[in-house]
Every structure is written in C-alpha cells, then in structure tokens.
C-alpha cells in the first residue's frame, strides 16, 4: 500500500516486458536498463507524471535519440509500452504463449514519427465480473493488461500480480443471501428467522415463511436491520474482502419481489429502497473510517438489475453521500436480445432495457454507470457464440447514454476458441467505443489463421449469424425455449409449444432452428476441412527431430503449433455447440410432434434425441466454478445443455406408455 513503491514495481515490470519482447524481435540486440540517457545512444525512456496515481492515459513522444513513453501514472506507462509493442506488430489474442503473435524477426524497430496520445473515457473500469473463488489465472491477467483491461475479482493467489498490473479488484455481489440466511444462528442460540422475522420482506401475496424468506427483498425500513447489515458489511470489508478496492453491494436475487410493507412502499420503488439502504451503508462506512474501524477507503458498486428489482431509475433523488463518495452503478441487462440493437424500439427484450438506461442517465445529478454485458451468462454454458454483429452498435449506444465502464459475465478461463474474438473486441471497444471493428476482426483472422483466414472468415460469419437469436433459445426467465422445456413434465403436452415474439409460432421456430443448425453444420464442415488441410501440409512437418536452431525455424514451428491449437480448439468448441443446439431444436420439435399427435414423427425425433444424448454424455465441456464453495467443476457436455432431466422425464413417459422405441 505504498503508492511510490507500487509505481516503481509497475514501471520496472513495464521495462522488463519491453526488453523481453524487443529481444524476441532482435535476438542479437544489446538492451540494458539505465537510470539516465547516454548521449548518442538510442533510448526508450519510461516516465510517469505521478508516482502516487495509477492513471492509465499515456503518450508516445518521439525524441531526437529515441522515444519517451509517458504515462499519467504507473499504469499509463505500462499501457504505453504495450502500445509501442503493438506498433511493432505484437498481438495478444488469448492468454498464454499460444495467444502471442510476434512480428517478423529482424525487421527493425518502427518508431512513431508523430506524438501519440491515448486515454479511455471508461474511467470506472474495463474488465470482467467473475464467478467462483477458484477463477484466477496469471496468464489471463497478463492478457488483460496487454489489452488495457483493468477490472477483475479479488483473488488471493494473483492479488500481488493484479496490484502490479493496475487491476482494480472487486468483491461481494449478492451478499445478503448468506448474511440473512433464515437458519443462520445468532448469539442467543436462535436462528435469524426466529429472532427477527420482521427483517424479512412482506411478499405481495401470501404470508411470510422461513422457506420463502429469501424470495422477497428484505425490509430495508426496519430500524434494527440496517445497523445489523452495516456491521456485517464492515466485518466482511475488514475480513475476507480487505484487499478489494470496490465492493459489489447487490440485493437478494429474487427476480421481481420487493417488500410491500407500508414503510418500504413509502420509500419509493425497488431502486429507491436500495438507494435508501446504500446511503445508510455509506454513512456508516464513512463514520467507521473516521473512527479508525475501517482502515482504507472503499467504493460501493450498486446494481441496476431486474433480479433485485432495481433496473428502473429511482423516483426520488439519489442520496448525496453516494454521489460524494464516488460510489457507482452497474447496469445489468441480463435478458437482453442480441438479434437487435440495444436501442431498437421494436425489440420487446431491449426496449425496456434501453429506456431504463436512458432514464438513469437523465437523472441530475446521477451515479456513474458501468454496463455489465452477458456474452457468456450461465445459461449460455460456454457455447461458441459470437456477437460481432451487435457489439460495435451497442457500445456506441452505451457511450451516448453515458456509460463510463464495461464488464461482462462470465469470461471463460480456458477453451476460448473462436470466442477469443469476442474478448479482443470487448477490450478494444471498452477502451474506445469508436474502435474499427471490421479492421480488428480482419487483423485477428489474419494473425490467428494466416493463409486460412479467408476460410475462417466464413466460419466466423456463420457462427455469428447462428448466435443472433440465442436469447430466444437459452436466456433466463420463462420466455426462452430452454425455460419452456425445463418446465415440461415430458408427457404429451396439453398446449402448443410457447415461443417468444421473436419466433412467434412453433412453425417459425422450426424454420429458424433449421437455418441456425445449417449454419453451424456448414461452419463445422469448413473447420474440419481446414484442419485436415493443415495436417496434410507436409511442408510444415519437420522430420529431423531436432530443436529449431535459428529464429526462422523457431517462428515457423511456433506458427504451425499456434495454427493447430487455434483450429483444434475451435473444432472442439463448435462440436459441442452444434450438438447442443441440435438437441434443443429436436426437443422443441419433439414437443410439437407429441402435442399434434404425430407419434411417428415423434418417434423419429426421439431416436435423434437419444443419439445426441449418448454423444453428449461421452465428452467433457470444462470448466465451471462454484459460487458457493471452493470447487472446480468439469461437467459432461450433456449436463451443460441443461436438458438432462428433461430427457429423463420424456423417457419415463415413453416407457410408461409402452412405446416400442422407448429403449433404442
């Protein structure tokens, strides 16, 4: 916690990164560290305007005998170094050495002819909102810094590295489920529910109960509850969250149920109730800081999210102490549609989200807003989805509506495959919403696939098109096909398959599903053919079984290994994606066939479902992370479709009916 020592650490690391990369370009170069320039010798000087600030703006300033890389703070120096390396041709497309793409060796340094200045308007941060205590990776964090990202969850094993890289660490989240667990024992020996049933929210319908206590937001108007929560918050901040720079303070994830008691209703809507509580927290934390009970400043990140009934802007002014403290809001459109622009008034999903975000921005004065995107929300289960079609437009909308930061759930720790493009685009757009998406994508494909970039462009375009309706297929809430299937008992349906207004009818769903599947299968075929061509390229295969001895040989071997890695990882991910989406389509079609009494067609579809089930059972799709305990989970692919139990119910129905194809 010594800012000047931290600055020296980060700037020293920047110097080492610069030297390491330059030596890979010019192995015979003599590069040394000095404390001052030597007359007549080319030098790259690293300078921070402030040793006590972590400002990430930077400038590359040509000098008579070299270059000055100047940062507003220590992080700006680091980002300036990476900007200079990008000028040389370096790219970091995914974590680890497999994602490092170097320039041709021996080409000499490219010095900027004119001054380069850059700064991001995303001052709240750019990064990932993560799940799971075990989700940490040094390679990922280094990739983030190299791509100018600076927000991640606090994790103990990589905490020092995050400090060095200038990454802002967050903790907390939906914290009150544990703090207000009804069966939590109190010092008196009674459970929290038995001691304080009045603390739990009054539901709109029916009585309170221990079993349903956490399905309604707690009663923020209870005079004894707020002090209890304040002390719990302080205990966590001074305990397990002590190293975090910011704390996510989010309500119960109840999806739409707020306390309806008279005093809570008098506070305003659900958002007003949240802000009332947060204001008390802020006042308490400020007093604790002044009294020495809290030993460091900490920001609160509140949330605008329909799961906590806080999506809509407040009806009353925002408390001044939240504004004064620099606390901010995370805007979380979890069920947004990717087939339409975020601001498309014709989209039943996005219309409400865009209106609410605009409403937050129109409040004066208002809390700064960070947008939380959902490119890998838990319902998507690491499917090979691409969002290039929507990202450029949406980031422009976010900027116009005042967004000052960007994060997304949940970045995969491994197996990026083609999703590396989403991560690269997200990093570039989070820094600069005006970034040239077409140029970035073209460069990405060229560097990742070399001579095969043209083939892979068609693969990426097909996957992108197939991803557009993913919200209608698999989103949270009961409008998606997945939710409809999960609520089905597996028997003969009593009503037609319900689809959202994007599909409109089961017949339109059927047509759209077959088109989506055709796109994925075509992409899969091209991937297989490309990988086969690479494997049969004998010119790239060495037979002398010796280590490469010169830079050209080393580069050739590295490029060949990187290409194989990229294609093989793409293939594995797309096999899983195609299997999953085909299973979903066939399940929806099977439902419709049963409802229509078309038992022969249902039998044919059931055989296909059975085949897909067996295939998905045979391979793993890692990784997921437990949010409840220290667990790392590698589920089979069938489990990750979230249809295992639905298929089991369907099978039971068929067996009970004594249908001859019940066992295939």
Task: Show where each model-derived region lies.
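Structured mid-domain segments that build the active-site/substrate or prosthetic-cofactor binding neighborhood
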Residues: 225, 235, 240, 348-454, ...
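Catalytic domains of carbohydrate-active enzymes that cleave complex glycans
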Residues: 402, 428-664
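Aromatic-lined carbohydrate-recognition surfaces of secreted/lumenal glycan-active proteins
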Residues: 278-313, 369-376, 408-409
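Short, well-ordered secondary-structure micro-motifs within conserved domains or adaptor modules
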Residues: 29-56, 159, 163-165
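Acidic/histidine-rich, surface-exposed loop or edge segments in extracytoplasmic proteins
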Residues: 1-9, 214-215
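Substrate-binding cleft/loops of secretory-pathway carbohydrate-active enzymes
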Residues: 301-334, 382-389, 415-422, 580
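Feature activates predominantly on carbohydrate-active enzymes
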Residues: 13-17, 21, 60-246, 250-269, ...
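Acidic, His- and aromatic-enriched active-site or binding-groove loops in soluble protein domains
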Residues: 167-176, 191-198, 267-281, 319-340, ...
């Amino acid at each position: 916690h010594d800012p000047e020592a931290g600055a020296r650490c980060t700037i020293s690391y920047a110097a080492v990164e610069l030297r390491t990369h330059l030596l890979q370009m010019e192995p015979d170069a003599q590069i040394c560290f000095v404390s001052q320039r030597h007359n007549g010798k080319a030098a790259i000087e690293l300078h921070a305007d402030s040793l006590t600030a972590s400002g990430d703006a930077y400038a590359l300033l040509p000098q008579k005998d070299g270059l000055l890389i100047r940062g507003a703070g220590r992080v700006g120096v680091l980002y300036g170094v990476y900007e200079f390396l990008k000028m040389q041709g370096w790219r970091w497309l995914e974590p680890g050495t497999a994602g490092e793409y170097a320039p041709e060796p021996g080409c000499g340094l490219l010095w900027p002819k004119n001054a380069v200045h850059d700064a991001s308007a995303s001052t709240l941060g750019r990064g990932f909102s993560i799940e799971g205590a075990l989700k940490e990776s040094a390679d990922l964090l280094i990739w983030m810094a190299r791509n100018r990202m600076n927000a991640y969850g606090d994790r103990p094993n990589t905490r020092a590295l995050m400090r060095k890289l200038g990454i802002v660490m967050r903790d907390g989240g939906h914290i009150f489920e544990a703090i207000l667990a009804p069966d939590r024992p109190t010092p008196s020996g009674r459970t929290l529910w038995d001691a304080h049933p009045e603390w739990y929210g009054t539901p709109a319908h029916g009585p309170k109960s221990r079993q349903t206590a956490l399905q309604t937001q707690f009663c923020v108007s209870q005079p004894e509850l707020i002090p209890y929560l304040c002390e719990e918050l302080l205990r966590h901040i001074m305990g397990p969250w002590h190293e975090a720079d910011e704390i996510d303070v989010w309500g119960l994830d109840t999806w739409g149920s707020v306390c309806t008691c008279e005093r809570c209703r008098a506070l305003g809507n659900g958002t007003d109730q949240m802000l009332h509580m947060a204001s008390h927290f802020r006042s308490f934390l400020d007093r604790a800081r002044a009294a020495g009970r809290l030993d460091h400043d900490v920001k609160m990140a509140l949330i605008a999210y329909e799961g906590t009934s806080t999506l809509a802007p407040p009806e009353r002014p925002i408390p001044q102490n939240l504004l004064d403290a620099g606390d901010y809001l995370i805007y979380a459109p979890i069920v947004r549609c990717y087939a339409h622009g975020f601001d498309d008034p014709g989209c039943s999903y996005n219309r409400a989200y865009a209106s609410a975000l605009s409403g937050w921005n129109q409040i004066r004065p208002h809390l700064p807003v960070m947008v939380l995107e959902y490119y890998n929300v838990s319902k998507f289960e690491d499917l090979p989805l691409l969002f290039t079609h929507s990202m450029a437009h949406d980031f422009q909308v976010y900027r116009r509506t005042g967004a000052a930061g960007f994060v997304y759930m949940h970045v995969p720790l491994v197996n990026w495959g083609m999703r590396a493009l989403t991560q690269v685009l997200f990093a570039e757009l989070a820094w600069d919403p005006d970034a040239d998406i077409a140029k970035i994508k073209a460069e990405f494909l060229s560097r990742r696939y070399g001579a095969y970039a043209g083939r892979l462009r068609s693969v990426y375009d097909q996957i992108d098109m197939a991803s557009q309706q993913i919200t209608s297929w698999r989103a949270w809430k009961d409008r998606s096909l997945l939710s409809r299937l999960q609520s089905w008992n597996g028997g003969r349906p009593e009503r037609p398959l319900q689809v959202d207004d994007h599909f409109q009818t089961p017949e339109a769903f059927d047509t759209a599903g077959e088109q989506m599947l055709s796109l994925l299968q075509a992409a899969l075929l091209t991937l297989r053919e490309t990988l086969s061509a690479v494997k049969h390229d004998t010119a790239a295969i060495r037979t002398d079984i010796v280590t490469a001895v010169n830079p050209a040989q080393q580069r050739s071997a590295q490029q060949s290994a990187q290409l194989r890695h990229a294609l093989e990882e793409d293939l594995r991910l797309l096999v899983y994606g195609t299997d999953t989406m085909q299973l979903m389509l066939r399940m929806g079609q099977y439902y419709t066939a049963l409802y229509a009494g078309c038992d022969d067609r249902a039998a044919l579809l059931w055989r296909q479902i059975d085949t897909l089930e067996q295939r998905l059972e045979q391979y793993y799709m890692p990784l997921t992370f437990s949010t409840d305990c220290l667990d790392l989970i590698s589920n089979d692919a069938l489990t990750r479709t979230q249809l295992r139990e639905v298929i089991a119910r369907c099978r039971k129905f068929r067996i009970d009916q004594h249908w001859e194809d019940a066992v295939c």
